[in-house]
Amino acid sequence: MPPKFDPTEIKIVYLRCVGGEVGATSALAPKVGPLGLSPKKIGEDIAKATQDWKGLKVTCKLTIQNRVAKIDVVPSAASLIVKELKEPPRDRKKVKNVKHNGDLTVDTIIKIARIMRPRSMAKKLEGTVKEILGTAQSVGCTIDGQHPHDIIESIANGEIEIPAQ
């Protein structure tokens, strides 16, 4: 028999979900059911919390204490980039593996890098900016009309100055 569940204990559960949609409660049930929470209610709360990430895949962090769930959205670099492109949300069921062809500025990339900084493995902000540029390359967008890899090279050569913090 497993030990009795301690209500004051803080449990953290990470979930991948699509913003603004109530995910499959069948996926939530095994994660939150044993903690004494209703998967349906959690699903609705997640949909509410991820409203401004409509149609994008984001990671949600559920912090559960005393049978109350607090939901934080932990966006990936890719979803931050796609959100900054300000493209209209697409129908996920019809359009698959979409290539984004927007254009971002270096300042926007630095802004995204600052958001991602705590989770980055880089020593300096410059390294985090390069990580974000690599993701931008995968997403398929351009930076100031240039390919992201050209920007990475010009940062490495010192042509583009990245602030220390």
From Swiss-Prot:
GO terms for biological process: regulation of alternative mRNA splicing, via spliceosome; translation. Gene3D superfamilies: Ribosomal protein L11, C-terminal domain (1.10.10.250), Ribosomal protein L11/L12, N-terminal domain (3.30.1550.10). Transmembrane segments: none annotated. The keyword Cell membrane does not apply. The keyword Ribosomal protein applies. Keywords: Ribonucleoprotein, Ribosomal protein, RNA-binding. It comes from the Eukaryota. One of its GO terms (cellular component) is cytosolic large ribosomal subunit. One of its GO terms (molecular function) is structural constituent of ribosome. SMART domains: RL11. InterPro entries: Ribosomal_uL11, Ribosomal_uL11_C, Ribosomal_uL11_C_sf, Ribosomal_uL11_CS, Ribosomal_uL11_N, Ribosomal_uL11_N_sf. Binds directly to 26S ribosomal RNA. Belongs to the universal ribosomal protein uL11 family. This is Large ribosomal subunit protein uL11. It comes from Caenorhabditis elegans. The lineage of its organism: Eukaryota, Metazoa, Ecdysozoa, Nematoda, Chromadorea.
